[in-house]
Amino acid sequence: MTLFKWSKLLGAICMIAIILYGWSGFSQTPGASVRLTTNPPINQVRPLEAEATTALGSGHYNPPVQLMLQAFDAQGQSLKNAKIHLQLFTREKNPWFTTDFPIVEGTKLLDIEGNAPTGQLQVQQTLPIRGTYKLQVAVTPLLKNAFEPFEQTLLLTLPENPLKFRYFGILVVILLTVGLLGGWVIGSRQAIQPGEIAPQRVRLLLSGLIVVAIAALVFVNISAELAESHMSMSMPGMEEVPPSAQPAQLKSQGLEMQLSGDQSARVGQPAKLQVSLSDPKTNQPVTDVVLKVTTTQLENNWVAFAYQGPPDSNGKLSWEQEFFDGAPHSIVVSVAPQANAPRQFQPFQVAKNIPVEGVAPPMQVRLISLAYFTAIVVIGLLLGLWLRQRQTQPPDLTWKRSVS
């Protein structure tokens, strides 16, 4: 091949490399995106405590964490007149290292779509369990062809409460100590009476361990079954939850607001809810208002979810939320006029109470937890046997001769 052909081939290769480099650089140019911020910072947030007692917790329920989603264009400017659809999912299921609410693992915690005139969507959500939450965000324009719709997936990792590690460490030490003492007693040299297969102390210890293990297994399973039975028996009484002080539908000052959706819920499954606002005279939707939604657990009065924003073009706000605590919840929606709206009125609200059916942890999760605790006791037992044998083992005669 001549020098001229080699130069042509080299030039073609360089041209292809330049084109590919330019294309890859263009494809990596940042486009529209969504930025997530939390208040307080996520490293200061802790999962919900099932029982916020001073003995086993902080003694109070923390307010929900504020999730702020801000949409930006390719130039880093806020996207105006956008509609943001948020889906919030909990961590994936892991029966080997479960959380306080295993039924909630791998489920959809929230699904809401709201208008964002400034490109920002804010919700307040109580996060029930530790782990990595997945936020699927879809941004579309309110005005047709204002910008290209896009989707983005964000991750939010919630650390575990440090108190849980402290209490777990204390429990492990107790179980290891019990096993260690048992192994120490079993490994001791004791005379076996005629007709006995083991010394009396060993037999008593083994019998006690068997009784404790059986009692623990029976307690874990019966308590769970009783909880399931109690919840199934209480299902007909779910309608007896005291009604809310405010009605679910109200006409006031020339406006009509109605809160509708599922009448009951079940832990681990999202409930569908909707609020609509209209003018009863013209039967037209009202959109120049601000809606504020608050979901409160009634037994301990902690806020599970809150949102504030305008309705859609049909005067409606629809959302799905999961109730991860098996207790009645109150949903309150208040409406107020926007600051620059021509229609001004006094704020009013509608509300309703929703009974929530609790679900006991799966049998698999309970058995795995019992197996972990049993394994810790067995490890302590083997360690006690080993230490006892080392103490009672006679010295090596060869070692004695070498010393003498």
Named regions from a protein language model:
Residues 2-10:
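Bacterial N-terminal signal peptides that target proteins for export
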Residues 12-21:
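Bacterial N-terminal signal peptides
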Residues 24-403:
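N-terminal soluble domains immediately following signal/targeting peptides that reside
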